Swiss-Prot record:
EC number: 2.2.1.2
Name of the protein in its database record: Transaldolase 2
Subunit architecture: Homodimer.
Organism: Shigella sonnei (strain Ss046)
Catalytic machinery residues: K131
Coiled coil: none
Length: 316
């Protein structure tokens, strides 16, 4: 049995890609997209019809060019998501504009709009996850959306404080990042030789997984942002893992026994009182890595969102 099939015995595998053909090849349960992945996919000629449709929608649904570009971007994200849902049996994650990461109300408004666009294409909201950055405002937006039956995927998660606040808000799913945590520590104190058990990104997800299970939180833990297959194999047993096509390929090509590494702890504890905003900000602020990586992640997604807007604006 190849490693990918081995992992699928214990974990729900999700494709981290906007490339529909790549997703088709690996038979994942779900798929995740973000502005960077959409930008990459939008540059491929086979998806030109999705862009043309989004452009036509933008022209029809915006008065100014700025409004047309925003409308086209939203429609493009939904077009890709709807196509992906023809392939995966589960859900697709679609991201709210990263520039709204510190605005609860506008994040809620954008999320509702994206869900509405999906529903206009005949996609039920039960098949959509709305991705929001794990800022205090993003978590509060998700808390309200969950009450409306709009499930959320809280992304750019680097600290335990973020994970705890998400669970306390009752969000559907979190995406704790492994590779970007590894990158931060590797740049400062390189691990040579590499020991997966000491990988700070792997340890972060394990800690969150154990805490959630010990306190009976129902929020799904989906490890994300991997740099190497060892990180993925070390988290086998995690609720879900979202994996890029290049790493799915490596796992599919290697035949090796896969052992479950994450198992819910037998000991359980009562849940603590929910964190206040002040506690959240203080705890998150204790970790330079988490502060830097959350800020950087938001900036990078915003840059790619602007590039996507520029690409569409040139076609309007």
């Amino acid at each position: 049995m190849n490693e990918l099939d081995g992992i699928k015995q214990f974990t729900t595998v999700v494709a981290d890609s906007g490339d529909i053909e790549s997703i088709r090849h690996y038979h994942p349960q779900d798929a995740t997209t973000n502005p960077s992945l959409l930008l990459k996919a939008a540059g491929l000629s086979q998806y030109e019809h999705l862009i043309d449709d989004a452009i036509a929608w933008g022209k029809k649904n915006g008065k100014t060019q700025e409004q047309q570009v925003v409308a086209a971007c939203d429609k493009l994200a939904v077009n890709f998501g709807a196509e992906i849902l023809k392939i995966v049996p589960g859900r697709v994650s679609t991201e709210v504009d990263a520039r709204l990461s510190f605005d609860k109300e506008k994040s809620i408004e954008k999320a509702r709009h994206l869900v509405d666009l999906y529903q206009q294409q005949g996609v039920e909201k039960s098949r959509i996850l709305i991705k929001l950055a794990s800022t205090w405002e993003g978590i509060r937006a998700a808390e309200e959306l969950e009450k409306e039956g709009i499930n959320c995927n809280l992304t750019l998660l680097f600290s335990f404080a973020q994970a705890r606040a998400c669970a306390e808000a009752g969000v559907f799913l979190i995406s704790p990042f492994v590779g970007r945590i590894y990158d931060w520590y590797q740049a400062r104190k390189p691990m040579d030789p590499y020991v997966v058990e000491e990988d700070p990104g792997v340890k972060s997800v394990r800690n969150i997984y154990d805490y959630y299970k010990q306190h009976h939180y129902e929020t799904i833990v989906m490890g994300a942002s991997f740099r190497r297959t060892e990180q993925i194999l070390a988290l086998t047993g995690c609720d879900r893992l979202t994996i890029a096509p290049n790493l799915l390929k490596e796992l599919q090509e290697k035949v090796s026994p896969v052992v479950r590494k994450l198992i819910p702890p037998s000991q359980t504890f009562p849940r603590p009182a929910p964190m206040s905003e002040a506690e959240f900000r203080w705890e998150h602020n204790q970790y330079a890595m988490a502060v830097e990586k959350l800020s950087e992640g938001i900036r990078l997604f915003a840059v790619d969102q602007r590039k996507l807007e520029d690409l569409l604006a040139a076609k309007l």
